[in-house]
Amino acid sequence: MGESDRFCYVYSCDLDISVRLKIGSLEGKREQKSYKAVLEDPMLKFSGLYQETCSDLYVTCQVFAEGKPLALPVRTSYKAFSTRWNWNEWLKLPVKYADLPRSAQVALTIWDVYGPGKAIPVGGATVSLFGKYGMFRQGMHDLKVWPNIEADGSELTKTPGRTNSSASEDQMSRLAKLTKAHRQGHMVKVDWLDRLTFREIEMINESEKRSSNFMYLMVEFPCVKCDEKEYGIVYYEKDGDESTPISTSSEIVRVPDPQMSMENLVEIKHHKLARSLRSGPSDHDLKPNAATRDQLNIIVSYPPTKQLTSEEQDLVWKFRSYLTSQEKALTKFLKCVNWDLPQEAKQALELLGKWKPMDVEDSLELLSSHFTNPTVRRYAVARLQQADDEDLLMYLLQLVQALKYENFEDIKSGLEPTKKDSQGPMLESMTTSGINPETDSSQILSNPLPAVSSPAPPSKTKDGLDAETLEQDLCTFLISRACKNSTLANYLYWYVIVECEDQDTQLRDPKTHEMYLNVMRRFSQALLKGDKSVRVMRSLLATQQTFVDRLVHLMKAVQRESGNRKKKNERLQALLGDNEKMNLSEFEPIPLPLEPQVKIRGIIPEKATLFKSALMPAKLYFKTEDGGKYPVIFKNGDDLRQDQLILQIISLMDKLLRKENLDLKLTPYKVLATSTKHGFMQFIQSVPVAEVLATEGSIQNFFRKYSPSEKGPYGISAEVMDTYVKSCAGYCVITYILGVGDRHLDNLLLTKTGKLFHIDFGYILGRDPKPLPPPMKLNKEMVEGMGGTQSEQYQAFRKQCYTAFLHLRRYSNLILNLFSLMVDANIPDIALEPDKTVKKVQDKFRLDLSDEEAVHYMQTLIDDSVNALFAAVVEQIHKFAQYWRR
């Protein structure tokens, strides 16, 4: 037999050595991302795509079989490339030939850096280790790289390195097979002709690769030689052909574990020992040492979102009697209680009556979803009774949301049956009262209610608390206070109406929707039972609802009108002027829903206009009872609840800062959602900063035009400049804390008196449609309005920012408690990640920093915002977009 006809081979199961693979070169071009992709994903600029030379790529290899990895991946060592990617490196795979199954394949992925500690796949290729005849691959192979994905190691791989999908790849595959046949001695070897042939094959392959849209990775499988002879590696498994009987039925033996669903006895015992339930009375005399006292003070100072460890909970319980003198410690103590243990709950409620009364602001936390014990919630309501109407109004929006965490049956039981059907079901009694459950919630007040009997007095508590202070649940408290104050009644009505009409809640949580309907029914009953002034209040609320319904009907008629904005304006004014049809130009005085202290008696038709926007909101001038004018914006087709929340928080922050003798000249204009689709906004006479810069050239020119002063700074009235500086500082800090996004010069407004304020809060809590937004909206033009970064006014601005930030940090618990009550509200940016809402606000306060560190942090934020170059580019892009829109 001739030498060329002899085939030498070795079984794979006899090779107890590791598999090796050589990574050669990568050929082809990478497609560079567009600038739009960089704007959408800024981290791309750190990837190798944007290097002038070849980027520092690396390759990972991993062996798979039956879609599962056989070993950990290995990677090429670091190598810097200049003109081409060429590793030329042998990799030792952590698997031996003897351990390879017939279906083994190697997955090769090429990686590029992508920012700190991150990498993205350039492409991947997968190739089987054994050929179709069971021969281990040998020699050089060009593998097709599938771009932008990792190599797929599954059986039906999505990244095959060897394909026959095109004519060019057919040519390369044919030449590869001929080269393999030559290497195995199936062709006569002629040295001079072989050199020419292999050079021509290499040129053809290079040409085919260049004309292809794919990249190709060259790999080399080792050749086995012994005594100068080449050996092929043939897959073979000893006793692999023998049949092995297997059972078709399940052999799994299930052993029941009776303790699986039971509580851990050790943990229960530890809990009881740590809580010392038997030695409860002796804990009264326990006093902490200095170190323990410091630890308790740290625990008490934790923000509301901080979860206490089991050790911290045991420590608070141990010194509970000592902590009764600290009102701030009550919420931490109540979080430590296991309410499922009757004895522990009893002790906790006994202590609740002895605890130093907590502040009204802190009691809001007890109304969140974390506290379900009815006595604890009634204690929080008892603390709220100490708040005056003005403070209660600041929290009313959140208190209406807190009704979702009350006992719905208790709320329903407060409904009073009619005399006629007092023994019948509640549903029937409501129907007899004219309030059918299917009736629109807005009609509840307009339906007359019959006389009703007084409800039974509340039962007395046995938990050591004064029963008189725990009479009312939250619903009863809100209704009773609203019946005594027309302003509270106004806002309670509209806040509850919006919840009643929320179709998302009705579909997703019908029980909550029914609860709000019951609240509205109880409110209506309470108003009807009151004296004459309270019944008048009920009548005015019903009239308000009718007025809003007519206004919505008017706006829909205008929106249906064909033609441009001018024609729609004319239609709006014509409909308003037709008092017989619409009854909007002249009517009996009623409280304005947006601000009930203002009594309105009609709309001035000739002053009504529509704004330039998709929904075309209307600017309306109301005639007030005292002969004045009150401008508002009425939006139909827009959910104002997010704006309403942010303006409420801004108004609260303004009040808190004024309490600290810091007036930052804020403009918390009023917003009221009268439905999920329409509402009112107070109109403030002002000019967008973008328009100021376009018409006057600068903010200072605008001030000099309307408030000139020879003695003032830069020829501007000192009072106006002071107002501008303070309002800039206030809104910079507040919008930073609330994470307000989409800030541009069109939603920053300026008044002639120097007040700067923000509008349009469609993006909050860190959301922003623009890439790389600065921490706060503070651009070059705003700083130049103060006189530049070296001016005295700019330094005053920075100091005001530091002072405002420190003051608001001290009230962080109140602000966080208010947001915690809003997590289940259908507010768009809260509904996206409700579980992270409070954490997002808390992170902005940086409560982990001392006051001095917080000032340095704010300094850095201001400097970063002023020097943000990308924000200036985005502002110019927005400016051009607005220009082309017009």
Swiss-Prot record:
Keywords: ATP-binding, Autophagy, Cell cycle, Cell division, Kinase, Lipid metabolism, Manganese, Nucleotide-binding, Transferase. Residues 604-870 form the PI3K/PI4K catalytic domain. Its cofactor is Mn(2+). Residues 414-464 are annotated as: Disordered. CDD domains: C2_PI3K_class_III, PI3Ka_III, PI3Kc_III. Residues 610-616 are annotated as: G-loop. One of its GO terms (cellular component) is phosphatidylinositol 3-kinase complex, class III, type I. Residues 35-184 form the C2 PI3K-type domain. PROSITE patterns: C2_PI3K (PS51547), PI3_4_KINASE_1 (PS00915), PI3_4_KINASE_2 (PS00916), PI3_4_KINASE_3 (PS50290), PIK_HELICAL (PS51545). Pfam families: PI3_PI4_kinase, PI3K_C2, PI3Ka. SUPFAM superfamilies: ARM repeat (SSF48371), C2 domain (Calcium/lipid-binding domain, CaLB) (SSF49562), Protein kinase-like (PK-like) (SSF56112). Residues 445-454 have a biased composition (Low complexity). Its main location: other. Component of the PI3K (PI3KC3/PI3K-III/class III phosphatidylinositol 3-kinase) complex the core of which is composed of the catalytic subunit pik3c3, the regulatory subunit pik3r4 and becn1 associating with additional regulatory/auxiliary subunits to form alternative complex forms. Belongs to the PI3/PI4-kinase family. This is Phosphatidylinositol 3-kinase catalytic subunit type 3. The gene is pik3c3.
